[in-house]
């Protein structure tokens, strides 16, 4: 789980760097921001453990959301800290590969590698796809974390397997008060 927090921090840095300027002009309209009002375009965004019920035909591996575009070949290099405060390096690369997810959606593979003193300590293939509304969905990950000299894959999950479900990585129309889940895998990623 500590490596998962590091990975999320790196991905968040990449997304926030793109999103912050866009949200600077967002304000609250005083409207309803409950989960029932979590709308983006014409789709309701997923909340908590409710199933997403996705149509694979509504998705593309071409991710051009203006708040978090993922063109093939894009790469981010970030510095993160582990729970002990030690500096780590992270490289996130949008691969020219796709994966058919268990729920039927074909997703873009994004490789995320965390390095400690130049040696990989975590490698992850994250899976993303964009719906017709422009929302970027997160479909899980195949991850390996180096723990006590051994690679641990227990953080891996895939939407459509063992009750895991997709979530939103970036809404098409982000706004203050918009709520949605990022991922769901009961007992592992909630």
Where are these regions (language model features)?
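Bacterial N-terminal signal peptides that target proteins for export
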Residues: 2-13
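Short Lys/Arg-rich cationic patches that frequently serve as NLS/NoLS or arginine-rich RNA/DNA-binding motifs
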Residues: 4-6, 27-30
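Hydrophobic helical h-region of N-terminal Sec-dependent signal peptides
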Residues: 14-20
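C-terminal motif of bacterial Sec signal peptides marking the signal peptidase cleavage site
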Residues: 21-25
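Conserved functional acidic sites
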Residues: 27, 34-190
